[in-house]
């Protein structure tokens, strides 16, 4: 059987249910943003969730560890990242609960179906435009810059996938807050103020 962890990779402890994540230091590794998002998002019993721009799959795996949802899916454009995520799912024996799909966020509603899920999460590329980009096909560039999808693409496809009264959770940079609110209004996603936590 093929080894799940390759020689250039490492195994990181997620500090939940004994789950571990396979990461490649040459690709984008998760940070505190993903952890905070997975802690803030809530998936109720019987609900299904999709994580866009899932990278190495850390968010759907953490969501499974913290919630009682029916199923968690991750969508990732880059084949090498999707492969990492699938191997982490297999390593943690989560094949029945977590699925990783390889595909384009711009077509997410076609892949998963319209009004098909209760929850969408996303830790998207934060940076706009081509400033500082040396190679638009570089894995790190795709993870950090809007070269393959835009904020508009992400919010549009999320709105299409969400059922009535579904929930959209996104972590992003404050400098784009006005644009985020405007884009959410464009696609009829209402901002819900929660204090101190959506779990209360």
List PLM regions with ranges.
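Class I SAM-dependent transferase core
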Residues: 2-44
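Short loop/edge segments at beta-strand edges and connector loops
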Residues: 23, 102-103, 172
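Conserved SAM/SAH cofactor-binding pocket of Class I
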Residues: 40-122, 128-130
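Active-site-adjacent beta-strand anchor residues
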Residues: 52, 75, 170-173, 194
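Short amphipathic alpha-helical segments
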Residues: 86, 132-135, 181-184
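Conserved Class I SAM-dependent methyltransferase catalytic core
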Residues: 148-192
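Conserved small/polar residues in nucleotide/adenosyl-binding loops
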Residues: 193-200
């Amino acid at each position: 059987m093929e080894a799940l962890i390759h020689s250039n990779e490492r195994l990181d402890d997620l500090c939940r249910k004994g789950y571990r994540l396979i990461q490649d230091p040459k690709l984008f590794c998760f940070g505190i943003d993903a952890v905070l998002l997975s802690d803030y998002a809530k998936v109720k019993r019987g609900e299904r969730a999709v994580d866009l721009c899932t990278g190495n799959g850390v968010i759907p795996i953490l969501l499974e560890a913290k919630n009682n949802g029916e199923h968690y899916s991750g969508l990732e454009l880059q084949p090498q990242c999707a492969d990492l995520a699938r191997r982490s799912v297999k390593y943690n024996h989560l094949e029945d609960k977590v699925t990783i799909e390889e595909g384009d966020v711009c077509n997410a509603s076609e892949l998963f179906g319209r009004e098909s899920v209760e929850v969408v999460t996303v830790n998207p590329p934060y940076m706009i435009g081509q400033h500082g980009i040396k190679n638009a096909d570089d894995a790190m560039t795709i993870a950090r810059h809007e070269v393959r999808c835009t904020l508009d693409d992400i919010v549009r496809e999320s709105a299409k996938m969400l059922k009535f009264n579904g929930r959209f959770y996104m972590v992003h940079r404050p400098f784009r807050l006005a644009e985020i609110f405007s884009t959410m209004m464009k696609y009829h996603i209402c901002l819900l103020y929660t204090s101190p936590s959506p779990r209360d």
